[in-house]
Amino acid sequence: MEAKAVARYIRISPRKVRQVVDLIRGKKLNEALAILRYTPKRASAVVAKVVRSAAANAENNLQMDRDELFIKACYVDQGPTYKRYMPRAFGRADVMRKRTSHITVVVSDKKEG
């Protein structure tokens, strides 16, 4: 069985979040949380929160054993982009793109194959 958790509209660029998510894919739950705890990136706290949420969903909704869980899948999709303007010289303006992310984590209790 598998359980999942999703965090949407997170105000961090998807490219930066993917660097963190790639570190934990396929790892055991406790190992993934330890990696995230010692990763010096802003996205690691958000990803850890989603991992803990997926584990709680597995425990409470599906009665799965927390010690058996591993990260089956985790991926980051791009959310909407906020456009802001920055004044430049000679009366011009540049568009600043504030990117958002949707983070999905799927945990499972047994490896397939």
Curated annotation (Swiss-Prot):
One of its GO terms (molecular function) is rRNA binding. One of its GO terms (cellular component) is cytosolic large ribosomal subunit. It comes from the Bacteria. Keywords: Ribonucleoprotein, Ribosomal protein, RNA-binding, rRNA-binding. GO terms for biological process: translation. InterPro entries: Ribosomal_uL22, Ribosomal_uL22_bac/chlpt-type, Ribosomal_uL22_bac/org-type, Ribosomal_uL22_CS, Ribosomal_uL22_sf. Pfam families: Ribosomal_L22. NCBIfam families: rplV_bact. This protein binds specifically to 23S rRNA; its binding is stimulated by other ribosomal proteins, e.g. L4, L17, and L20. It is important during the early stages of 50S assembly. It makes multiple contacts with different domains of the 23S rRNA in the assembled 50S subunit and ribosome. PANTHER family: CHLOROPLAST 50S RIBOSOMAL PROTEIN L22-RELATED, LARGE RIBOSOMAL SUBUNIT PROTEIN UL22M. HAMAP family: Ribosomal_uL22_B. Belongs to the universal ribosomal protein uL22 family. Part of the 50S ribosomal subunit. This is Large ribosomal subunit protein uL22. It comes from Pelotomaculum thermopropionicum (strain DSM 13744 / JCM 10971 / SI).
